[in-house]
């Protein structure tokens, strides 16, 4: 743990933490100061000018990053009949119905994303207490409740991510790994920013993107100028 602390302290000294960087510059700094012995995830945090106490200012959705996240996610699909076959053909890791529900009720969570056809949601809804807290409950807003299970699975495997503003109006999202090139990270970042701008609630007042910070898994946050966020 001391070694991790030492690396972090060295990283902090390597740049001006108060400075507001251009996006590409910030990403270059994050890559430069990443010292962990594993391929760290690069994550962006956006503080938005929204009041999530109001239903019309809650932001949630999904998008496909052009270069993916660098991580292959395992997908569980709740479907029957032809839809189950379509999910399997598209590359779903687990496909089932009552059998999968029984496994989850027994404590199994060997998957990263859950997709369900609409007709299965009555059954899947019973798992809300265990899937909800883990952020695994299928939702139409993120495209995980759909009859087009093949498309959903392929998009997730291609690098689809979900985003959601927390109570403080902050959105955290991965945009790749430190092994990605600066250009790949920037292109992923740019698509994310454009998506969030399009998702701006009509009721939101004042500056929308208040602050932006990018960091690697074990590294300190590098600030991006919110005025030049994209």
Swiss-Prot record:
The gene is rplA. It comes from Desulfitobacterium hafniense (strain Y51). Belongs to the universal ribosomal protein uL1 family. Signal peptide: none annotated. Pfam families: Ribosomal_L1. The keyword Transit peptide does not apply. InterPro entries: Ribosom_uL1_bac-type, Ribosomal_uL1, Ribosomal_uL1-like, Ribosomal_uL1/biogenesis, Ribosomal_uL1_3-a/b-sand, Ribosomal_uL1_CS. This is Large ribosomal subunit protein uL1. Part of the 50S ribosomal subunit. Binds directly to 23S rRNA. The L1 stalk is quite mobile in the ribosome, and is involved in E site tRNA release. Protein L1 is also a translational repressor protein, it controls the translation of the L11 operon by binding to its mRNA.
